[in-house]
């Protein structure tokens, strides 16, 4: 067997082999849990799980009821990957409490305890039961008496071979299995059988039937409830579980069940009630659910109460566990574990599976363990055990004691340490060593002695203050403990300090200006130097804020800052920070920025009338330039943004903080703001004042564009533009309409009490058509009447024409166009004529779907287009005016011409010579339903122009003279009485050269260039049209 120190040396050696091969004590991955094993299980095998990791691999053994399980002596036992397997388990031999014990070279840990129990359910011993005889109306209890068993049971009853259902009369207790009938009725007579089920094995057994009969000696009278099923006086309940309380009473009439808490608190909302309130179920039981509960059974004869106390308990639960500790020799170890539980847990400690007691260097107090002056024998596996009467929990940790000589291999002294003259330097010395070593220092070959400048700390660090050039050199730290000595050497280089030669100075500038803040230094040129600037404590980002900030200077000893287009937000403290690898320093300057004033504050409406408002405010910041004036602005729901307003005084100087706004509109909601100005500019506006409405006043603005006319017979229609709301001057705004026949003296008046009214119709049979009236419209509101608008002349409604147009005639112009003619109505016509309305429809369409077109004035003909070819159309004409249309003329008929040819000219061939183009094409023949071809139209234009010229010919060829060089686009289409037919594809003819050229419409890729022309000569008989 190795000594403890040998194990420690071996452990230290193995730790160095590989980072991914860490040696450690056993750690439980999975601990055994309680097992309820069904005796009738087909598997015939029990597994108690235990999984452990550790390096070296731990050895696993098991205990039952505190005694080692001898795997070799009983073939039924085997351990597979740490778990215990029991073949053909026996409830007599194998039931008990098991623990898993894991051990490797670092120590031993024990698992939590796990109980192995066996679930079974035997058959009922008796086969028959005595008959139960009861009176009608009497309460009854049928006993179940379950047979021997292990494991939780559930109960049900069968009544005459059918399941007995539960209601407010019947109740089956899941605690006793008994069947309770609160009040027996005739329908309850029969055989009752108790059914018992083991919830673990699902095995079910039936008890012997119990016959129930009714007695013949009368009926049971009414009586108060008698509680037969009630919960115990004390019911312990575990945290987080579901608690069920049962309560049922016999009685006549059938009692009702009510639950309540004795302390008056409401039962938790999560609680549920089942079986006609016979069961109170509380899920996820917590401390606040504990207390005294009452079951109240009540009927018309009285009530009874059953009481019981629900007590709360909780198994221990870790709040703070212990963790592995690696400690050097002669140091101390302190562990603390904490657990919650009800009742409060007690603590004990184990080392390598054995109890640990207080002695000498080891102090144990509840959940704390303190070991002083640690040595190698203290290494091992430790466990804190917390327990109460409801459970036990374990927390494990490993204590490693490190013993090694000083080693600098991973913590060498810094090779070079830079320091400035007059500065301070600390050289760290942190070798790995256990126990802590003793430190000495050398400079070169001389041992360093501590003095007022040189000190050596307890942890070995060397500190030198007020450094001089003579302190440069090599320094060696020597560490020594019981196991050996080691050293490490580093060099100190002393540099000249950095000094600021031209610092930035505080400045006073105006918005928009640009400045440079200097920052120039002298420094040791063997060191790199870095300049940084902060503004009000924040680092300036020259990339993000490059619009305003830029580093300038160009020399490594200058870090000047340029600030361009300075704004108010740039006022504040600027700090230049200079840093080298040996020192850093900073210098600061304040920048004051003068600019337009800030917004005034607390704009208040002190008094308001119908047209004025008295304002006051407090001045805002003047931004280092005195305020010279204030401007008042106002806004209403009707204005476009903020508008400057007139004030008294006219100009509000910078020392005045009140003003009267004049020229306001009455009964309008206003809000005001103030803008300050100084010699630099106009500042930001203040926040708006509260909204206030001016007082009411008489209206002053009259309606605009008073006019009218039109309407129906015997009507005078008067219209006007409404007065805008902001000019109505008060509530109750409306209009007064005044009118009289032209030349009369007496006005007729009508009042319209609506601000939105814009039209009035006077209807009277005495009103003659198209009679002149003098009209004016006035205004009023709740304050009184305002002025009237100027008088204007309005005509009454006219009468629609009374005579139809005469001499209606229509003719066809083409397949799509017809022309209609008519004459003015004959005889005296009472209504004036403003124009005519032509109605037309195709013979195949209905007249109500007819289309209409109108003419204006005295025009007595019109052209109708976009018609269908070869179609019969019906037409009629009416005269119209503002009153409507007059009677219709007689209907006339006209048929459009056949459609023009649909076939375009084909086989177009052209050739050119001596500035002439000759075109030839095939004759177009019309179809039977098309108009005969009368000739052809040749359309041509310059390639770069949109205007087109047209040549008509009755032949199938044409000759063009084109004196200028230009590309041409040419099309050809036939025409007939029905109109123009389909056009050929466009032909592009390029510029004409002296050489002979030719081409065809089928292919324009051979086309030659044509010259632009100003005159076209046709060599054959044709007529030209534009």
Swiss-Prot record:
CDD domains: FN3, Ig6_Contactin-4
Membrane topology type: Lipid-anchor; GPI-anchor
Subcellular location per the Swiss-Prot or TrEMBL entry: Cell membrane; Secreted
Signal sequence extent: 1-18
Region called Disordered, residue ranges: 685-710, 886-906
Coiled coil: none
Glycosylated residues, chain numbering: 65, 90, 191, 370, 375, 466, 705, 764, 858, 893, 911, 929, 954
Feature: compositional bias, Polar residues: 886-896
Matching InterPro entries: CNTN4_Ig6, FN3_dom, FN3_sf, Ig-like_dom, Ig-like_dom_sf, Ig-like_fold, Ig_I-set, Ig_sub
Disulfide pattern: 50-100, 144-194, 247-295, 337-384, 429-477, 519-576
Mitochondrion is among the record's keywords: no
Any one annotated GO CC term: extracellular region
Lipidation (GPI-anchor amidated serine): 1000
All copies of domain Fibronectin type-III, residue ranges: 599-697, 702-799, 804-899, 900-995
SUPFAM superfamilies xref list: Fibronectin type III, Immunoglobulin
Expression tissues: Expressed in the region of developing olfactory neurons. Isoform 2 is expressed in mature sensory cells of the vomeronasal neuroepithelium and at lower level in olfactory neuroepithelium.
A Gene Ontology BP annotation from the UniProt entry: brain development
Pfam families named in the record: fn3, I-set, Ig_3
Ig-like C2-type domain residues: 32-117, 122-207, 225-311, 316-400, 406-493, 497-586
Residue ranges the record assigns to the propeptide: 1001-1026
Keywords (A to Z) from UniProt: Cell adhesion, Cell membrane, Disulfide bond, Glycoprotein, GPI-anchor, Immunoglobulin domain, Lipoprotein, Membrane, Repeat, Secreted, Signal
Role: Contactins mediate cell surface interactions during nervous system development. Has some neurite outgrowth-promoting activity. May be involved in synaptogenesis.
Family named by the database record: Belongs to the immunoglobulin superfamily. Contactin family.
Full protein name: Contactin-4
